[in-house]
């Protein structure tokens, strides 16, 4: 092979690798940076939080919006699931799986209802289970909610829907875009990584929810 041919072949493989390289560069796991922790203090990381900051990780991802645009997303989670989330969101990005937005719940003052109504995908929030004294898996950074407006928590035989704005999506017999179901790629990926899906619960159904 001549020198020009070798150069052209090398250039071809370099250009071929650029999309994958750019994709990898959009994904990372790190300890929670000081600037991010300042955003969390008094919001998702409340006074009396029992999870040490050192146990949390800051995950940056890329995702496709509902309109097909590529956006950056950020997640704070427990270190135990950080690599799982990184791999899952890489697969979802490769599949062009639509996610409305992925922002820290601190952008909504750690108000779970506001975050869900905005269809925001989020993870860590030190709080108790609604109507209970038990800590939520979100409080440990071991649960994440995906496209929550389209995939609400449905209980009391459908009488209670959370968020209330998601009532139109409570009847899962209907077919509509962005519905999480057993055959959905997102559900399959989370289950493959050992997560439990709230859509499999017996007495209530939390279709947005994945926990480990």
Briefly describe each language-model feature range.
Residues 12-21:
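Hydrophobic h-region of N-terminal signal peptides that target proteins for export
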Residues 129-131, 135, 140-212:
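Catalytic cores and adjacent binding grooves of peptidoglycan-active enzymes
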Residues 103-142, 151-153:
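Active-site-adjacent loop/helix surface patches within enzyme catalytic domains
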Residues 51-116:
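Active-site acidic/histidine clusters and adjacent loop/turn architecture
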Residues 23-69:
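N-terminal module-boundary/linker segments of secreted carbohydrate-active enzymes
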Residues 1-8:
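Bacterial N-terminal signal peptides that target proteins for export
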Residues 62-64, 127, 149:
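Structured loops at beta-to-helix junctions and adjacent beta-edge loops in soluble globular domains
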Residues 17, 93, 195:
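Hydrophobic/aromatic-lined pockets within catalytic cores
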